[in-house]
């Protein structure tokens, strides 16, 4: 663990990268982050895909007031405390889009649109058509990220993977398993948690088959919950979003996390993996009338960013 002074110095320097507005400097920030930098009337914000960052501009007699928080309800509570609740509406909040530096000028009414500068811009067609080369690069990046994470956490803490037996969670589980053994640590600290609702579910069967084939069934722990544990309203409240697939995923994930917390009150670290199919441009376009082969291929970051900040369908509030 880092000493407090070193952590603060690092945070100040990292915020300075965002404050520079230089996308190349922001791109060098490692790990997940959500950062805000203010210089005079100019506020710059940036986040990675794993951290939400929302903002709202309120009006005070002395000028515009920028409120920044992770959640919409945090913004609402702050405005209520400040006697500004009458200005609030959820649709007036804005999400800082991932992979951009968002620059807001606090110059008063009318508030100008923010300026977006992309700092993460992956290049297309960098790799050959060799699937082994693509797989090595993809899983190698995953291993590098997980290894850095293991370096920062308690080496004795138990680790859980939210496991469906699919390629994404399977890759995360196997890479973690490999990393623990390569560090001379016990794989017994690793568990594959799988949700089973009312004694049924394809994930539980798939998870068992996956691990049986690898002689790793001892890692599996199936978490049984009743149908009543699936609470859509709670899921929407947690993610503050409405898209059906996201709500469906969050509903199951929340039920699984709550059951793990009940069973292991002190468990702290959970890892999840998703989006691998989409990263390799495998989309069920037959199930989504909005998607075409052209829209999938022409939008490099479709899974992570949706239609993108320059598209008419992009949601400023939910992204």
Locate each region found by the language model.
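Glycine-rich phosphate-binding loop signature in dinucleotide/nucleotide-binding domains
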Residues: 153-156, 260-267
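Low-complexity, flexible helical/coil segments
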Residues: 80-86, 226-231, 254-261, 304-313
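Cysteine-centered catalytic environments shared across enzyme families
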Residues: 1-223
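Catalytic subdomain that performs nucleotidyl-dependent activation
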Residues: 287-319
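ATP-dependent adenylate-handling ligase core
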Residues: 195-260, 264, 277-297
């Amino acid at each position: 663990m880092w000493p407090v002074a070193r952590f603060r110095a690092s945070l100040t320097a990292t915020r300075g990268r965002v404050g520079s507005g230089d996308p190349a400097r922001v791109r060098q920030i490692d790990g997940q982050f959500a950062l805000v930098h203010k210089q005079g009337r100019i506020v710059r914000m940036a986040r990675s895909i794993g951290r939400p960052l929302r903002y709202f501009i309120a009006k005070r007699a002395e000028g515009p007031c920028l409120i920044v928080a992770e959640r919409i309800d945090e913004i609402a509570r702050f405005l209520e405390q400040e006697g500004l609740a009458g200005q609030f509406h959820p649709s007036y909040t804005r999400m800082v889009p991932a992979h951009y530096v968002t620059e807001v000028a606090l110059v008063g009414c009318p508030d100008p649109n923010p300026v977006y500068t992309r700092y993460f811009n992956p290049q297309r067609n960098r790799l050959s058509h060799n699937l082994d080369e693509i797989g090595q690069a993809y899983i190698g990046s995953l291993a590098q990220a997980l290894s850095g994470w293991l370096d920062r956490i308690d080496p004795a803490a138990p680790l859980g993977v939210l496991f469906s037996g699919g390629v994404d969670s399977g890759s995360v589980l196997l890479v973690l398993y490999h990393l623990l053994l390569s560090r001379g640590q016990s794989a017994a600290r690793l568990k594959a948690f799988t949700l089973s609702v009312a004694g049924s579910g394809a994930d539980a069967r798939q998870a068992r088959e996956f691990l049986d084939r690898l002689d790793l069934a001892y890692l599996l722990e199936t978490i049984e919950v009743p149908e009543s544990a699936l609470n859509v309203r709670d899921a929407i409240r947690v993610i503050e979003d409405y898209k059906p697939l996201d709500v469906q995923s969050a509903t199951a994930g929340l039920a699984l996390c709550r059951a793990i917390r009940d069973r292991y009150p002190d468990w702290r670290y959970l890892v999840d993996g998703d989006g691998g199919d989409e990263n390799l441009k495998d989309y069920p376009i037959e199930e989504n009338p909005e998607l075409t082969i052209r829209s999938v291929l022409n939008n490099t970051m479709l899974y992570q960013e949706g239609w993108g900040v320059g598209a008419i369908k992009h949601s400023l509030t939910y992204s």
